[in-house]
Each structure stands twice: as structure tokens, then as C-alpha cells.
Regions:
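Short glycine/proline- and acidic residue-enriched helix-loop micro-motifs
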Residues: 98-132
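Active-site metal-binding loops of divalent metal-dependent hydrolases
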Residues: 10, 160, 206-207
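Phosphate-coordination/substrate-recognition cap region in phosphate-metabolizing enzymes
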Residues: 34-112
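Generic beta-sheet signal
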Residues: 4, 152-158
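Acidic, low-complexity terminal tails and accessory targeting/binding regions
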Residues: 83-105, 146, 150-153, 168-219
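A mid-sequence, solvent-exposed acidic-amphipathic segment
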Residues: 126-153
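Loop-to-helix element that buttresses phosphate recognition and phosphoryl-transfer chemistry
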Residues: 3, 10-62, 129-136
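Conserved beta-strand termini and adjacent loop/short-helix elements that scaffold enzyme active sites
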Residues: 7, 77-79, 205
């Protein structure tokens, strides 16, 4: 049986000019996760990450924490990229004019409303439709599971959205459950997928025992 570990990137720079940069906490989360996995004897046969900086740097931090650096060169698969959440919110037709993007709670409320609008296929000037997003993530998940042969461990560093879509697809391919998963995925958490003769199955979701106190973040 093979295993795919879906890892959400560490904390990025919410409210900054460039969100796609790990915070100091984000770097620490990646190193803590790598050390935690290494302590449990996890040695990846392949490491995959999306094309985003926060995903790449989380994979780097994990390798540093685990001592994997240089052992398994990472492979870039843009299918694991996050959707343009900033552009999606900006294109939401009911966006409040006075929304403070640095206010976590206010942003989260509007983000969930905009995401529901986008997922339902409602009109908007979006850079990517939800259906296109779901299709590319499912294709990336297929590539990862196919590469996880008997005894293999494939580590995939991605983002909350793609991991949520993958979980929804594994539980019920006909249901758009991803929004419920997406709102609770912790930075640097691990979601385990096992791959056997009957295909891929979701084993665990959102593991984060390596995090305590201020290292436990959602955004």
C-alpha cells in the first residue's frame, strides 16, 4: 500500500503586499512538521509541491527539519496551486466597499460568501472558474496517487483549497464538500491518503500534533 501526505503550507503573510511569503511562524511550522515526521520514520520517496512560493518554501523548511535536504529533489506540479483567493474576493459582486482586508474575521466572513458564490458558478470576473479549479486539482491528485506505489510515501505540499477539493473528491465525488474542509485546515497540517488495490482512500484529515500555542494558525 502507498501513502500520499497532503500538507498545507505554513502561515503566509496575511494582510501584507505579497501574501505568497511565509511568515517566521510559517517557516517554523514547516520545520516542526519535518522533525515530527522524521521522528516517526517517514522518509518520502517523492516530494511534490505547487508552483507557489509559500508551497515551495514549506517543502524546504520541512526538508530542513527532517534532514531530508538533498535526498529527494522536489517536483513542481502547478496543479496543486491555490486558487486566486484575493482575486476571487475582489470579483465578488457583493463585496463591502469598506472591507478591511487586514481584519481576519471580517475577511473570513466575506471570503466564505464569495467562495460559495464562486463554487455555485454564479457570474463574476474570476480568473478561474470553480469547475476548472476542481478539474485541475483532481488531475493533480490522480498523478500523486498513481506515483504512490507499494511502500511509497509521496509528500505533496499544497494549500487549503486544493487539499479540501481532494478530500471532497475522495469522500463523495458528486458532492462539493470542499468548503467545509477548507475553513478548518491548519497551516502545516497533514492529511493522509492511502492507495491500494481498490484505489485511493482518505485515511486522516488535518493532523497537527506538532503544533502548540502560537504555532497553531489557520491563516
Amino acid at each position: 500500500m502507498g501513502v500520499v501526505l497532503l500538507v498545507r503550507h505554513g502561515q503566509a503573510s496575511f494582510g501584507a503586499d505579497d501574501y505568497d511569503v511565509l511568515s517566521e511562524t510559517g517557516w517554523a511550522q514547516g520545520r516542526l512538521l519535518g522533525a515530527w515526521l522524521a521522528e516517526r520514520g517517514v522518509t518520502p520517496t517523492a516530494v511534490v509541491h505547487g508552483a507557489m512560493r509559500r508551497q515551495r518554501d514549506t517543502a524546504l523548511a520541512m526538508a530542513e527539519g527532517a534532514g531530508w535536504a538533498g535526498d529527494v529533489p522536489p517536483v513542481v506540479d502547478p496543479g496543486w496551486d491555490e486558487f486566486d483567493h484575493v482575486g476571487m474576493v475582489a470579483a465578488y459582486p457583493h463585496l463591502p466597499a469598506d472591507l478591511d482586508l487586514t481584519d481576519h474575521r471580517a475577511f473570513q466572513r466575506v471570503f466564505e460568501q464569495a467562495t460559495a458564490h464562486w463554487t455555485a458558478g454564479e457570474p463574476g470576473d474570476f480568473t478561474e472558474t470553480y469547475d476548472d479549479f476542481e478539474t485541475r486539482v483532481r488531475a493533480a491528485l490522480d498523478r500523486a496517487t498513481v506515483s504512490a506505489g507499494q511502500g511509497d510515501t509521496v509528500v505533496v505540499v499544497s494549500s487549503g483549497g486544493p487539499i479540501a477539493v481532494a478530500c471532497g473528491a475522495l469522500i463523495d465525488p458528486d458532492a462539493r464538500l470542499w468548503q467545509r474542509f477548507n475553513t478548518v485546515i491548519v497551516n502545516s497540517s497533514v492529511t493522509r491518503v492511502v492507495v491500494g488495490s481498490t484505489g485511493a482512500r482518505l485515511l486522516t484529515f488535518n493532523e497537527h500534533p506538532h503544533l502548540e500555542g502560537d504555532h497553531l494558525t489557520y491563516r
